[in-house]
């Protein structure tokens, strides 16, 4: 009698597997049970392709430093520093000292600062079509004695402020005062070493503005604002009195505490300049956390404020044109830094002078006498009808007969060396005119 083979006992969870018994085949219920995956076999809906990006992407990092200005003992509370005017335009002259300021970065301003060697690009955007901004970082060094505030406003506007016809965005200048920026979000208080000792630099992130989301054509986005910053000097020790005022200014009531002048201190551009002889305790020359000027009794040194930045960009696109590789065999891998004489010569002569071959109508060496008057032969050569000289032919082989052509020196000698003319009549005419 045929005896069936004994069924092998399962050595794993028999009772557990009985709950999830496969009823419709082995592959129909895969992914269910104790080893179930979340939506493993669910089909995703098909989407329509709306845009296609190029795979040719390049990252460009811009590293540099930006001057904010110098703090001098003679600067008033309303003095504005504009060192950026020296780089944004060729004819601009910026003021490098003041107690506050603000400006912005555009891609064009970064290129202008690269020409002045204030920053450097990690790569070039030649043969690319589109660009996008990925944010960056600003680094600040701790001052020795003075303190200042710094803020970044990434939501100012899209285009460059200097190129807009309206002046509505200039209203932000009226709010850059320490008493108002103290309670505004995004304002960083950078204290001196006398207040707080730090080993590393202050690091401030530069977010991507809302208007910079996505890719933009490179020629169109040169004037878009990347980030807008503002800064101001402030004194945490002399907050509610003017230390530069004469008399007992600490005991006097501030001029901006009355009912009529509660908001008059906000616009620092409307403050008065302190007189030379000294200010009184109730003069409108100072504001909360902002004395009339950096008093020499508190500060023994002037200060320079600046920051270091690192901005990140990406370029993409398939351009039909490609740049020519640089030939390193002529100038080497690292060129020589420009000297002062080279920079001045380039500024004085922007267009190079072209040297043309001399002709018989030119005043040649030896044509003038001791009194600076033309000789007879030179005068006759210049005033007579001279045919237009032919274009000098370079040294080489003519393609039609294979004979070597004349050099440039031979053609010039043939055009200049001609037989000396006779000028007896002109000499007599000159003698008659001299006698008259």
From Swiss-Prot:
Its job: Self-assembles to form an icosahedral capsid with a T=1 symmetry, about 30 nm in diameter, and consisting of 60 capsid proteins. The capsid encapsulates the genomic DNA. Capsid protein is involved in attachment and entry into the host cell.
Cytoplasm found in the keyword field: no
Protein name listed in UniProt: Capsid protein
Organism whose genome encodes this protein: Torque teno felis virus (isolate Fc-TTV4)
Entry's Gene Ontology cellular component terms: T=1 icosahedral viral capsid
Taxonomic lineage of the native organism: Viruses, Viruses incertae sedis, Anelloviridae, Etatorquevirus, Etatorquevirus felid1
Primary localization: virion
Polar residues compositional bias, start-end: 330-344
UniProt keyword list: Capsid protein, T=1 icosahedral capsid protein, Virion
Disordered: annotated span: 326-370
